A protein has these predicted regions:
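Extracellular, surface-exposed repeat architectures
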Residues: 37-40, 136
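Structural signature of tandem-repeat unit edges
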Residues: 23-25, 41-64, 72-86, 95-108, ...
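Generic hydrophobic alpha-helical segments
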Residues: 32, 132-133
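Low-complexity/repetitive intrinsically disordered segments
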Residues: 1, 177-183
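Short beta-strand/loop segment at the start of cytosolic alpha/beta domains
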Residues: 3-38
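Conserved "repeat-terminator" motif of extracellular CCP/Sushi domains
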Residues: 1, 136-137
Length: 183
């Protein structure tokens, strides 16, 4: 259902997930980003975020998640769209998800994205190259192993702080510096 229409697009609610749609008025690409969720509407559910949102006959690719979208919600699982390019800070902070597949389209994973996801045991990066991965797995106490993409432009500190059961990490081939606070 449409929440609000504005000159540059609209805000649309699809099963408790709010998408902000932007038109390409200035030569840029039309796109959508996820702005917030209704915590009670997504509780206990397997969330599938579509690659596109169609509104007034136009398809908008879902390219970003902004802010702490699912933070603190009781989502059961989430499937991210293959059009997503960036996952924001604290997007899944302290949720009960058990695994996450980061689509090949994602170039940036911001800090604290999976902070405190105590049930998280599996992380899959579908891409072989990423621009940035920031400290995103802090306090994931059941995370045992992670295999990063072959090449990552930037990895920041606090990546695995508090991951007490971590036994194996396969770091990118091109990594030239490991921050002392990475683990």
């Amino acid at each position: 259902k449409v929440i609000e229409e504005v000159g540059a697009g609209a805000t649309v609610d699809i099963e408790g997930v709010l998408y902000v749609l932007h038109n390409s008025n200035n030569g840029g690409a039309s796109h959508a980003f996820i702005s917030e969720v209704a915590k009670t509407a997504v509780a206990g559910k397997n969330i599938v975020i579509s690659d596109y949102v169609t509104y007034n006959g136009k398809k908008y690719p879902v390219t970003e998640m902004r802010g702490n979208i699912f933070s603190g919600t009781a989502i059961k699982s989430v499937k991210l769209p293959s059009t997503l390019t960036e996952i924001s800070n604290s997007a899944f902070r302290e949720t009960p998800i058990t695994e996450i597949v980061i689509p090949a389209s994602v170039k940036i994973v911001q800090g604290s994205t999976y902070y405190g996801c105590k049930n998280l045991t599996k992380v899959v990066f579908e891409n072989d190259v990423m621009d940035e991965v920031h400290g995103c797995f802090q306090k994931c106490i059941n995370l045992k192993n992670v295999k990063f993409p072959r090449r990552v432009g930037l990895m920041s500190y606090d990546m695995f702080e508090g991951c007490v059961n971590l036994t194996e990490v396969m770091l990118p081939e091109n990594l030239s510096e490991i921050y002392s606070s990475m683990f």
